[in-house]
C-alpha cells in the first residue's frame, strides 16, 4: 500500500435536516503513486488502512476526496468551532465544499501539506514569521503598511445553478472579490494557478442583493457584462460579503455627492472668470417696422405672421365673421390677401346663381332632415290569397270611417244568385167533340188560317195552314 503523507484527527462539518454539526474523524492523506491517485480519506477511528490496529479501520461512506478535483484550500473563520482553540479551513472541489477543523498547529500543517500535494507546481511553503527577512542584492524590505484594496474582501464561493449562471457557464468554486466600485469573480488559471478575473458587476448596475446563512445572491441589470439575471453563490460567509458590499456602496454614494459638489463649484468659478474676461457680443437686431421684401421667399414658403390662434377651417359657415374680429389689435394682412378674397367672392357668386346645388356647410353634420319615404318603400306581403282570389277585401273595420254616420262605410249588399228565366208554357187547345178527320173544310180553314208566335225567347212554334183534307197539327214544347 501507499505510504501516507499525513494523518491525524480532523473535525468534519456535516449538515442534516438543516442542522450543522461537527463529527470527529481520522484523516489520512495519500500522495499520487503508480498504485493510486492523491486522495484524502476519512475513517471512524484511528487505525491503519493496511490492517494494523484493532480490527482495522472502517472508512466512512462516500468520504474520500480526490485531490485532482481540488480547487482551493484556504483557512476560514467559523462562529462555532468544534472545540476551543480549533482553527478551520475549507477544501473546495468542483462539486462541493468541505469544512474541516483541527487545533491551530495541526490546521496550519494540514493546509500546507494539502496545497503541496494538490498543487505541486506552486511554491506553497508558508513563511516563517519567526525567521528574519532575507535581504536580496537590492536590499528590499516589505512595507508593513501596504495592503491591497481587496485584502479581507475575497471570499471563496460555489456557484449555484440559475438561468443566468448557466448562460455565463459558471460551475464550481470561484473567488468573489468585493472592490470599491464593483464585484469581481475570479478563477484559477489553468496553468499559472493565479487568480484571473472572469466577470465583474458594477454596483451602479446591480438591482438588488441579499444574503442567507449559507449563500449570497444578487440580481444584475441588463447593462452588466454578464447580462440580466440572478446569481447565487453558496458560502458560509454570506453575511460578511453582504456587509462589505453595503459599505462599498455607501462609500461610493458619499464620494459621488462630494464629486458633484466639487464639479458645481468648479463650474460656477469657471463661469465667473469667463464673464469677467469677455462680455457677450450684442446680436444685431432687425428694425421692427421694415416691411418684408416682395420676392424674398418663394410663394410656397410664405409664413403666417405670429398672432392669436386662428379658428379652424370649418368652424363657421362660409361668409360669417367671427366674433371680436374687429376688436383689439388689427392683424397684418397677408401679401396676397386681396387676390384670395376676390377669388372667394367669385366662387360664392357662382354658388348663389346655381340654385340647384345645395350649400355644403349650411347644416351641421348629422342634423339634416331625413328624406321622406316613397310609396313603395315598405312593401307588404299579401296574405290569404287562396281565400281572396284577387278580390278586394272588404271588411268593416278596414273600410274608411264615415264621420257623418259615426260608422264605417258598409259595402253594398252582394247580389244573390241569378234565377233562370221561366220556361214557356205550351198552347192549350180547346177540346173538340169531333174526331180527327171529321168536320167540314170551313172549320179547319178557320182554325189553321192564323199562326201565333210567342215573343218569349227559347220557345219555338211551327204553324202551318193547309187547305185540304190532310190534317196539320201544331207542336209545342208542352205537347206530347
UniProtKB/Swiss-Prot annotation:
GO terms for cellular component: cytoplasm; nucleus. It holds the Pfam family PH. The modification N-acetylmethionine is found at residue 1. Residues 253-262, 432-445 have a biased composition (Low complexity). The modification Phosphotyrosine is found at residues 295, 336, 340, 361, 376, 397, 408, 448. The modification Phosphoserine is found at residues 48, 269, 290, 415. Keywords: Acetylation, Cytoplasm, Nucleus, Phosphoprotein. PROSITE patterns: IRS_PTB. Residues 253-328, 398-480 are annotated as: Disordered. Residues 151-259 form the IRS-type PTB domain. Constitutively tyrosine-phosphorylated. Phosphorylated by TEC. Phosphorylated by LYN. Phosphorylated on tyrosine residues by the insulin receptor kinase. Results in the negative regulation of the insulin signaling pathway. Phosphorylated on tyrosine residues by SRMS. Residues 446-455 have a biased composition (Polar residues). InterPro entries: Docking_Protein_DOK, Dok1/2/3_PTB, IRS_PTB, PH-like_dom_sf, PH_domain. Its main location: cytoplasm. One of its GO terms (biological process) is macrophage colony-stimulating factor signaling pathway. Residues 3-119 form the PH domain. The PTB domain mediates receptor interaction. DOK proteins are enzymatically inert adaptor or scaffolding proteins. They provide a docking platform for the assembly of multimolecular signaling complexes. DOK1 appears to be a negative regulator of the insulin signaling pathway. Modulates integrin activation by competing with talin for the same binding site on ITGB3. Belongs to the DOK family. Type A subfamily. Interacts with RasGAP and INPP5D/SHIP1. Interacts directly with phosphorylated ITGB3. Interacts with SRMS (via the SH2 and SH3 domains). This is Docking protein 1.
Amino acid at each position: 500500500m501507499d505510504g501516507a503523507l499525513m494523518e491525524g484527527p480532523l473535525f468534519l462539518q456535516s449538515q442534516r435536516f438543516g442542522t450543522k454539526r461537527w463529527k470527529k474523524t481520522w484523516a489520512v492523506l495519500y500522495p499520487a503513486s503508480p498504485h493510486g491517485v492523491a486522495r484524502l480519506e476519512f475513517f471512524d477511528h484511528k487505525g491503519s488502512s493496511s490492517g494494523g490496529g484493532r480490527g482495522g479501520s472502517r472508512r466512512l461512506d462516500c468520504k474520500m476526496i480526490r485531490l485532482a478535483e481540488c480547487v482551493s484550500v484556504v483557512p476560514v473563520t467559523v462562529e462555532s468551532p468544534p472545540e476551543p482553540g480549533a482553527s478551520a479551513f475549507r477544501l473546495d472541489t468542483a462539486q462541493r465544499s468541505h469544512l474541516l477543523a483541527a487545533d491551530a498547529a495541526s490546521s496550519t500543517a494540514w493546509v500546507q501539506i494539502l496545497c503541496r500535494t494538490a498543487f505541486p507546481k506552486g511554491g506553497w511553503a508558508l513563511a516563517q514569521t519567526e525567521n528574519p527577512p532575507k535581504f536580496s542584492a537590492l536590499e528590499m524590505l516589505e512595507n508593513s503598511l501596504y495592503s491591497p484594496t481587496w485584502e479581507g474582501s475575497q471570499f471563496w464561493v460555489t456557484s449555484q445553478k440559475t438561468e443566468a449562471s448557466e448562460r455565463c457557464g459558471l460551475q464550481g468554486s470561484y473567488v468573489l472579490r468585493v472592490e470599491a466600485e464593483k464585484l469581481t469573480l475570479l478563477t484559477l488559471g489553468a496553468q499559472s494557478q493565479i487568480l484571473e478575473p472572469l466577470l465583474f458587476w458594477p454596483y451602479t448596475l446591480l438591482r438588488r442583493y441579499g444574503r442567507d446563512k449559507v449563500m449570497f445572491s444578487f440580481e444584475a441589470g441588463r447593462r452588466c457584462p454578464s447580462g440580466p439575471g440572478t446569481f447565487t453563490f453558496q458560502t458560509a460567509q454570506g453575511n460578511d460579503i453582504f456587509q462589505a458590499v453595503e459599505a462599498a456602496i455607501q462609500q461610493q454614494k458619499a464620494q459621488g455627492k462630494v464629486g458633484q459638489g466639487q464639479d458645481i463649484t468648479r463650474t460656477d468659478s469657471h463661469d465667473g472668470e469667463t464673464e469677467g474676461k469677455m462680455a457677450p457680443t450684442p446680436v444685431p437686431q432687425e428694425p421692427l417696422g421694415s416691411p418684408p421684401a416682395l420676392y424674398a421667399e418663394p410663394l410656397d414658403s410664405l409664413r403666417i405672421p405670429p398672432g392669436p390662434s386662428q379658428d379652424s377651417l370649418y368652424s363657421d359657415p362660409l361668409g360669417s365673421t367671427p366674433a371680436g374680429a374687429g376688436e383689439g389689435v388689427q392683424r397684418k394682412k397677408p401679401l396676397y390677401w386681396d387676390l384670395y378674397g376676390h377669388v372667394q367672392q367669385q366662387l360664392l357668386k357662382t354658388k348663389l346663381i346655381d340654385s340647384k346645388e345645395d350649400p355644403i356647410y349650411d347644416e351641421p353634420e348629422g342634423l339634416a332632415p331625413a328624406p321622406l319615404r316613397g310609396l313603395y318603400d315598405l312593401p307588404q306581403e299579401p296574405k290569404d290569397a287562396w281565400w281572396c282570389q284577387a278580390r278586394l277585401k272588404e271588411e268593416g273595420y278596414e273600410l274608411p270611417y264615415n264621420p257623418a254616420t259615426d260608422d264605417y262605410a258598409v259595402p253594398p249588399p252582394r247580389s244573390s244568385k241569378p234565377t233562370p228565366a221561366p220556361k214557356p208554357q205550351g198552347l192549350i187547345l180547346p177540346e173538340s167533340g169531333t174526331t180527327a178527320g171529321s168536320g167540314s173544310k170551313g172549320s179547319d180553314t178557320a182554325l189553321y188560317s192564323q199562326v201565333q208566335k210567342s215573343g218569349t225567347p227559347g220557345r219555338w212554334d211551327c204553324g202551318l195552314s193547309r187547305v185540304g183534307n190532310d190534317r196539320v197539327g201544331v207542336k209545342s214544347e208542352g205537347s206530347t
